Regions:
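Bacterial Sec-dependent N-terminal signal peptides
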Residues: 1-24, 364, 371
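Conserved redox-active cysteine motifs that mediate thiol-disulfide chemistry
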Residues: 257-274
Length: 372
């Protein structure tokens, strides 16, 4: 009896770890159906089956309920695939007609949420269609037409995001809102996302939303008032440099995240050069952090644009340690750091950056600061 109890105690954690799921649905015989997972920003195919007798089935186990996608490719070339999000948890039924899941409490709730958001998504799509029709007409739209369409788009988007945020706020103990976090995190206000993260909402726990959690951690590191987080990369000569070699040394420093292939980055550089020329003698400095993956284009761009400041890179593209560290998912992006190493502003460009630097260097104590 004692041995049985010990064995049962050892097996109990294993039983709680492995959770089985079964996904079924109806499609025409011989239709190929796919199961995708989202361990990052890109969905990855994990399994596929060919329907038999008008049905398909996926089975598997997870350590916790996870968000997956069931995909049926279109019968005709050029048509979009049908994608249904599911929570892999128990017996799930996929309906490709309504593009919804059901069968468990999580999936029934996800179905209801999808139906709730659908009218808002349709409203947004209707405005997008008006933009497309206007472009295809070949007519030059008036300023008034463009303003009205832009306002309509913003209003439709705001209504949809309000609905999405409410679904998440009211279901902190559920997994299924992970679908909305993945699709709409970039539009949800950061304080709201921070709340979900800080309060450990269940939908922030699956692997599907881990990349969003990592972004939030990075965003927090770049909040104004935070001390910069150090990292190492190589300079043009191949020597290892730390960000702290240039930052927190008594001068204001702009850390400019860019890449040679980034058109908006290169268009912004003349503005930065003008400000560098204007204020460098008073201590202003720039550190260019490239998200290039090949050294030659990086070096050529620096030479062609005659960049006079410090330049570093780990040549890992979007897998750059700086991207993960500071939650950067688009460039150009900047950090303006004060003489003590505190971040005072982020993503300043053009006139905004010029105004900020003008304000800083109008102060007599800064104006008299010696160059580094």
């Amino acid at each position: 009896m004692k041995k049985f109890l010990i064995l049962a105690a050892l097996l109990l954690p294993l039983a709680s770890v492995a959770q089985q799921y079964k996904v079924t649905g109806k499609v025409p015989t011989k239709t190929k159906v796919y199961l995708f997972r989202t361990p990052g920003f890109v969905k990855e195919q994990a399994d596929s089956v060919v329907a038999k007798n008008g049905t398909f089935t996926f089975t598997g186990t997870t350590t916790q309920p996870e968000l997956y996608y069931i995909v049926k490719k279109a019968a005709k070339t050029g048509q979009p695939a049908t994608i249904v999000p599911i929570v892999a948890d128990g017996n799930v039924v996929v309906d490709f007609t309504t593009e919804t899941p059901s069968g468990t409490a999580e999936n029934d709730a996800l179905k209801a949420a999808l139906m709730q958001v659908k009218p808002y998504a349709q409203g947004l799509r209707a405005v997008e269609k008006q933009f497309e029709d206007l472009e295809l007409s070949g007519k030059e739209p008036s300023e008034d037409e463009l303003t009205k369409l832009a306002d309509s788009y913003e209003q439709a988007q705001a209504l949809m995001i309000e609905a999405v945020a409410a679904i998440c706020k009211n279901n902190m103990d559920k997994t299924y809102p992970a679908y909305f976090i993945i699709d709409y995190y970039s539009l949800i206000e950061k304080p709201t996302l921070y709340k979900f993260y800080d309060e450990k909402a269940k939908f922030m726990q699956p692997s599907a939303t881990s990349h969003v959690s990592q972004l939030i951690e990075g965003w927090k590191r770049r909040e104004p008032g935070q001390t910069f987080t150090d990292f190492e990369m190589e300079d043009l000569s191949g020597a290892t440099r730390k960000l702290s070699d240039y930052v927190g040394k008594g001068n204001y420093v702009l850390v400019d995240f860019w890449a040679s292939w980034c058109g908006p980055c290169r268009r912004e550089i003349p503005n930065v050069k003008a400000l560098y020329d204007k204020y460098h003698a008073q201590g202003f400095d720039v550190v260019g952090v490239s998200f290039d993956s090949d050294k030659a284009p990086w070096l050529n761009a620096i030479k062609k644009m005659n960049l006079p400041w410090h330049n570093i890179s780990d040549l890992k593209g979007w897998k750059s340690k700086a991207a993960a560290l500071y939650g950067i998912n688009s460039i150009p992006s900047t950090l303006l750091i004060d003489p003590q190493g505190k971040i005072i502003a982020t993503d300043l460009h053009g006139e905004e950056l010029e105004t900020q630097l003008n304000t800083i260097y109008e102060k007599s104590d800064v104006a008299s600061m010696p160059n580094k």
